């Protein structure tokens, strides 16, 4: 095989794998998180953008209110872009979703569910976050 053909095949392979890799890096448009009664905290995977909508429900069977915390990345650090406390048996649907602060740049966001009180468990809650 000629050197020219070999270089051509290798470059084609690199391009193919590069394009494939790029498809797996893409962030989801919406994410969900489920806080179970045995967990003191739980977080969703990341969603990319400048701001988000988030909502959720805290089950009637929960023993505590749950903090719904929208977090975003700035450089190496995570910051809070919105936070609401939802009592047991209450929640918000997607039509009445909370909105995070708006940033002037795109970054990763995630939704964190954290029962009220230090290291508290005993809550069953669902949370959702989506691109605006």
Where are these regions (language model features)?
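Sec-dependent N-terminal signal peptides of Gram-positive bacterial secreted proteins and lipoproteins
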Residues: 1-26
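Post-signal peptide N-terminal regions of Sec-secreted extracellular proteins
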Residues: 27-132
